């Protein structure tokens, strides 16, 4: 971490005092630069090309050194378009890796991979910056306690609990509620844990990034009137950007999150959407650098690159970074090297189901497909584990009976199976819940449900104590007391 004397970035004059080289070759987003003998920059150093193109337009391109080629030449990858660059242009070695602004000044703002604001709200306080390349915390700094990260979302906390400082894979297609779930998690961590969030948009659509920003402003996660009260910082490296930017934007977001964890000692949520695009960008850069491709055309350094990002996401004695990563699975092939390498790092998976979304059950988290390594009696306790297993068994039996119901109808089932179906339908509805960030759209107030309340509610449904209540009473409520109150209201309306 570096504390700069002024609030502005390094000026051109101070940069020009440093080491100077010249462009020898340009291959798309890759530059070869010649430096004087004995003045070679280090790997990962940031290089800056400043000047004017043939029509007099200002050029300012930042690159990152990737290879030392010999004969005083280095190969660097550009973080922005290389249009207008020519051979012989001056290149300044900054003498350090890319550094980005960190701290409270980043909240409510949108940054690019270089840590420059791109939201038209003026400059950001850059007195405190941090390099994007850092080693993972040492073993002695790690917090090895296995503790659950309570989200206040019933289906997640009960059936696929998140680990504090863990990594969660979020699987879901378009239109099943990924964005709303992400925003609710950002909102809940701010309210319940006093934490902040960092969102890294890696190689996804610019339109989606814009939609997310607008929805965050609408729901209050980003407070336009008082930016400092916002709960999230956004870092975007979208699909239209060069592979260098898409490969490094995840590290920029992670660096901002690390500051909140290590210096502010907060619990941080780090969202990466999409981790597959990080691998994809690495694959493009690898080919541009002339490395031999590995399995399915991916880079030979796939595991190393993934590990260097994932190992920095962890709990230390100061605070925690809990990461939720959207995972795109190419051609639905889970054995593809990119998702397969990602799975090795995940502690839990949250799978969103189009079938549940079609039924109007939100959050549309699939209770049978979502998994967590935390769901063990020694970690969550016997009561939680037993309740979760019984909920899953009931839902699984309901799933098995659905074909019979579709062909023969409910009446052909045994008494026991009919009871199972009735309870499963109540459970399915009770797994839905109104979200704070959806209040503006639905008009119903959001609910945060603590874990003990969640367990109690499902125990009451499973025990049969609530068999007499209509299943509609369990739909979009918070805790079980609200469901019983809703049932009484429904009764009153009938009379």
From Swiss-Prot:
Reactions listed under catalytic activity: ATP + H2O + 4 H(+)(in) = ADP + phosphate + 5 H(+)(out)
Keywords in alphabetical order: ATP synthesis, ATP-binding, CF(1), Chloroplast, Hydrogen ion transport, Ion transport, Membrane, Nucleotide-binding, Plastid, Thylakoid, Translocase, Transport
Pfam families per UniProt: ATP-synt_ab (PF00006), ATP-synt_ab_N (PF02874), ATP-synt_VA_C (PF22919)
Positions in coiled-coil regions: none
Enzyme Commission (EC) number: 7.1.2.2
Membrane topology: Peripheral membrane protein
Protein name according to UniProt: ATP synthase subunit beta, chloroplastic
Upper taxonomic lineage: Eukaryota, Viridiplantae, Streptophyta, Embryophyta, Tracheophyta
């Amino acid at each position: 971490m570096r504390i700069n004397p002024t609030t502005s970035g390094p000026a051109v004059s101070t940069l020009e005092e440093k080491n100077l080289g010249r462009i020898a070759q340009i291959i798309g987003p890759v530059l070869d630069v010649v430096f004087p003998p004995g003045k070679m920059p280090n790997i990962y150093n940031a290089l800056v090309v400043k000047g004017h193109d043939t029509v007099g337009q200002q050029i300012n391109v930042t690159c990152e050194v990737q290879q030392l080629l010999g004969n005083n030449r280095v190969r660097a990858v550009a973080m922005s378009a290389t249009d207008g660059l020519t051979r012989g242009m001056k290149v300044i070695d900054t003498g350090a890796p890319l550094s980005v602004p960190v701290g409270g000044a980043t909240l409510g703002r949108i940054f690019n991979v270089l840590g420059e604001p791109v939201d038209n709200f003026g400059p950001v306080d850059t007195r405190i910056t941090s390099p994007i390349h850092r080693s993972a915390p040492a073993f002695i700094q790690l917090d090895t306690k296995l503790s659950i990260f309570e989200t206040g979302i019933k289906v997640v906390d009960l059936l696929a609990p998140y680990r504090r400082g863990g990594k969660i894979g979020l699987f879901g297609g378009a239109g099943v509620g990924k964005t709303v779930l992400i925003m609710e998690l950002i909102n809940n961590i701010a309210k319940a844990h006093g934490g902040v969030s960092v969102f890294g948009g890696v190689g996804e659509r610019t339109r989606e990034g814009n939609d997310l920003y607008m929805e965050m402003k609408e729901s209050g996660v980003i407070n336009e009137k008082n930016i400092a009260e916002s709960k999230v910082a956004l870092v975007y490296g979208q699909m239209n950007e060069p592979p260098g930017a898409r490969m490094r934007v995840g590290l920029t977001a992670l660096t901002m999150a690390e500051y909140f964890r290590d210096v502010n000692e907060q619990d941080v949520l780090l969202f990466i959407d999409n981790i597959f695009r990080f691998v994809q960008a690495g694959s493009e850069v690898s080919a541009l650098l002339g490395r031999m491709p590995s399995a399915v055309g991916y880079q030979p350094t796939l595991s190393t690159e993934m590990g260097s990002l994932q190992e920095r996401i962890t709990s230390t004695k100061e605070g925690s970074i809990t990461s939720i990563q959207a995972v795109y699975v190419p051609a639905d092939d889970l054995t593809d090297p990119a998702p397969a390498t990602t799975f090795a790092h995940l502690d839990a998976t949250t799978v969103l189901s189009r079938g549940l979304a079609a039924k109007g059950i939100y959050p549309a988290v699939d209770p049978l497909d979502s998994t967590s390594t935390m769901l063990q009696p020694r970690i969550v306790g016997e009561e939680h584990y037993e309740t979760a297993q019984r909920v899953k068994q009931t839902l699984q039996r309901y799933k098995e009976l659905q074909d019979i119901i579709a062909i023969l109808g409910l009446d052909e089932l045994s008494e026991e199976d009919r009871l199972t179906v009735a309870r499963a339908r109540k459970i399915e509805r009770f797994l839905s819940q109104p979200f704070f960030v959806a209040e503006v759209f639905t008009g119903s107030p959001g609910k945060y449900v603590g874990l003990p309340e969640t367990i109690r509610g499902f125990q009451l449904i499973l025990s049969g104590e609530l068999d007499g209540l209509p299943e509609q009473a369990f739909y979009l409520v918070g805790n079980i007391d609200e469901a019983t109150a809703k049932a009484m209201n429904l009764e009153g309306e009938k009379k």
